[in-house]
């Protein structure tokens, strides 16, 4: 004779409804989600720290570049004024040379005229 069939015990811990394989307890799932979220938050925090460091480095480089640009502007201003002075100096030198050349030509013409008429 066979033993009477026993129905499956209901209310067993971890048993899925319908008699399927038992699922993870709900507390474990929420812990896993919490850990995943915390890992994502830590990753975002690390990325933001790197970004802040990069922004600070960029700010420092921009400050150095601004200082160099100011120094270059000052040098350009000095160069411009000295170039203008040099231009004026050689313009006057050229004028003096032209006056001397004109005077020499005038003297030569006067000498030739005097030589011809005497």
Curated annotation (Swiss-Prot):
This is Vesicle-associated membrane protein 1. Residues 1-38 are annotated as: Disordered. Is not targeted by C.botulinum neurotoxin type B (BoNT/B) or by C.tetani toxin (tetX) as their target sequence is not conserved in this protein. Pfam families: Synaptobrevin. The gene is Vamp1. GO terms for molecular function: SNAP receptor activity; syntaxin binding. (Microbial infection) Targeted and hydrolyzed by C.botulinum neurotoxin type D (BoNT/D, botD) which hydrolyzes the 61-Lys-|-Leu-62 bond and inhibits neurotransmitter release. This is a poor substrate for BoNT/D, high concentrations are required to cleave it in vitro. (Microbial infection) Targeted and hydrolyzed by C.botulinum neurotoxin type F (BoNT/F, botF) which hydrolyzes the 60-Gln-|-Lys-61 bond and inhibits neurotransmitter release. One of its GO terms (cellular component) is glutamatergic synapse. Expressed in brain and spleen (at protein level). Isoform 1 expressed at very high level in brain. Even higher level found in spinal cord. Isoform 3 expressed in kidney, spleen and liver. Isoforms 2 and 3 expressed in osteoblasts of trabecular bone. Also expressed in heart. The lineage of its organism: Eukaryota, Metazoa, Chordata, Craniata, Vertebrata. It comes from the Eukaryota. Residues 28-38 have a biased composition (Polar residues). Keywords: Coiled coil, Cytoplasmic vesicle, Membrane, Mitochondrion, Mitochondrion outer membrane, Phosphoprotein, Synapse, Synaptosome, Transmembrane, Transmembrane helix. Residues 1-15 have a biased composition (Low complexity).
């Amino acid at each position: 004779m066979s033993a009477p069939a026993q129905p499956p015990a209901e209310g067993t811990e971890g048993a899925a409804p319908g008699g399927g394989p038992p699922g993870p307890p709900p507390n474990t799932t929420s812990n896993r989600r919490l850990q995943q979220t915390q890992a994502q938050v830590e990753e975002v925090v690390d990325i933001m720290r790197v970004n802040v460091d990069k922004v600070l480095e960029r700010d420092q480089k921009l400050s150095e570049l601004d200082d160099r640009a100011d120094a270059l502007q000052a040098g350009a201003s000095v160069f411009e004024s000295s170039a203008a002075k040099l231009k004026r100096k050689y313009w006057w030198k050229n004028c003096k040379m032209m006056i001397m050349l004109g005077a020499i030509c005038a003297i030569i013409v006067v000498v030739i005229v005097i030589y011809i008429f005497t």
